[in-house]
């Protein structure tokens, strides 16, 4: 039956005799078979018996079966098929319920799957499924590891902004290093397309009264400020309808700050949030209330109430000066000092606060005078930048619309030594963590340690591939790639006792079991003979950081079989990410990266699942993937 269908599908292509590799590739595409051209080239060569660069219809059928008839899928099919030829509708129902854990299952779902994936018409009409149909279903998006529930906005978006992790970039204008690299609009466009919701704009005085964007005091190229925000306006809401925050690093004179203010108003129009929303004059609004809005994050003169009193007044030509304590950057001491007992709640005496300052190494400050155009200042509503001094100071004096920027070195020390106080701080105030200045190569830190304490804006260099950006992309797959992910309740509760370094004994851990079955057309290495292995990593609170590795399958990147089982006990699954990495074992220069996939642990489907692989730059490597079986219980 399947042979008859196959011959019917391809015979016209062989009317002229044998076909070339190019025609074979087109025919595979016609049959809806995704394949890696390099793999097909080697398979074609092996099956071209006369070595003439042309194959017969029988040779093509052999190639087709090598690519599509995977042994592990045949084994599953035969387990549920009564005659090893056809799945009855009831057989498919049994498979879906027992193996795929389709909890909201009804019989019509099985019927819909047959109608959608069964290519042989007479089989479809009989409400049955051939192996061809079953294989197509198993290779479809319905059998991906990522739960499609998480593929759309499903979380409550009416909480205040402080209750969300927000996808954030650092030095968004750069597409290379921070000393010589070019500034490019593509930095902003690509970040927005990926769902980034907080962009950084370094603004400096330019010629002809036109502010420019670049990395100051370096050889990086320059962009016009107005050109940057025009690009942002075009792409801001293509990937997500939720608010975009423009974090300004403002080094401009008051006159050019006015130019910036005028450009912002002219470019964004009503989308620019220049006044408080109704009912949100004393608390932060939600992403839902701020849909399709642009927020300016910058220093600000005076209070929000004073801004509202000036509503409608022309602020052009008006400049205010204030004195700010500028941080004198210090190196991390790297002493690895023993973690002291964390300080108590904010009502504890100031002696403990001073003790924490000495242990953590709160940076030194010096006075600095800053001039700000009132026209620009008044565009800052809910995201005023306020210098961070201490948790105690913020508790006493910081206002709801004031946010902090903390360098990674200081933030890391605070995370290790005062995690609970950090969580209580991020519960009330938006906190942005950014890479230290020494990262001239635009490298990134591990964002997980700052998500663990509730930091909303963990800003990374989006242009730099690697594990940190894999975690970033995986984290924000959740909630429909909207750029906003609701923080777990224990990071939002004002009475929280959560400490990522001291997970309570009565936590509710998740036991995760993954059976790594096989690889599917992994990116081929030298001569298509990669020695393939897979690493499965968990990122989360310190106790959840772990990884396991498969054995090496020699000289096989096309269809390696492992059949190995890994088990993880995850204490805080709400914060955990899982990363799958395929590598080619290297004996001298280290392992060669082949592909990876990262996603939140709680966004995984159970059952037989396909893990799509992505390149270092985050590009899809389809059809390269892993085939696994997932089970977890809590």
Curated annotation (Swiss-Prot):
Residues 312-345 are annotated as: Disordered. Residues 492-615 form the C2 domain. Its EC number is 3.1.4.11. InterPro entries: C2_dom, C2_domain_sf, EF-hand-dom_pair, EF_hand_dom, PI-PLC_fam, PLC-like_Pdiesterase_TIM-brl, PLC_EF-hand-like, PLipase_C_PInositol-sp_X_dom. Residues 321-334 have a biased composition (Acidic residues). Residues 376-492 form the PI-PLC Y-box domain. Keywords: Calcium, Cytoplasm, Developmental protein, Fertilization, Hydrolase, Lipid degradation, Lipid metabolism, Nucleus, Transducer. Its cofactor is Ca(2+). Its main location: nucleus. GO terms for molecular function: calcium ion binding; phosphatidylinositol-4,5-bisphosphate phospholipase C activity. GO terms for biological process: egg activation; intracellular signal transduction; lipid catabolic process; positive regulation of cytosolic calcium ion concentration involved in egg activation. It catalyses: a 1,2-diacyl-sn-glycero-3-phospho-(1D-myo-inositol-4,5-bisphosphate) + H2O = 1D-myo-inositol 1,4,5-trisphosphate + a 1,2-diacyl-sn-glycerol + H(+). The active site is at residues 170, 215. It is found in: Nucleus; Cytoplasm, Perinuclear region. It is an enzyme of class 3 (hydrolase). The keyword Cytoplasm applies. Residues 35-70 form the EF-hand domain. Residues 155-299 form the PI-PLC X-box domain. One of its GO terms (cellular component) is nucleus. PANTHER family: 1-PHOSPHATIDYLINOSITOL 4,5-BISPHOSPHATE PHOSPHODIESTERASE ZETA-1, PHOSPHOINOSITIDE-SPECIFIC PHOSPHOLIPASE C FAMILY PROTEIN. Interacts (via its C2 domain) with PtdIns(3)P and, to a lesser extent, PtdIns(5)P in vitro. The EF-hand and C2 domains are essential for triggering Ca(2+) oscillating activity and the regulation of PLCZ1 enzyme activity. The X-Y linker region between PI-PLC X-box and Y-box domains may be a target for proteolysis and may play an important regulatory role during fertilization. This is 1-phosphatidylinositol 4,5-bisphosphate phosphodiesterase zeta-1. It comes from Bos taurus (Bovine). The lineage of its organism: Eukaryota, Metazoa, Chordata, Craniata, Vertebrata. The gene is PLCZ1.
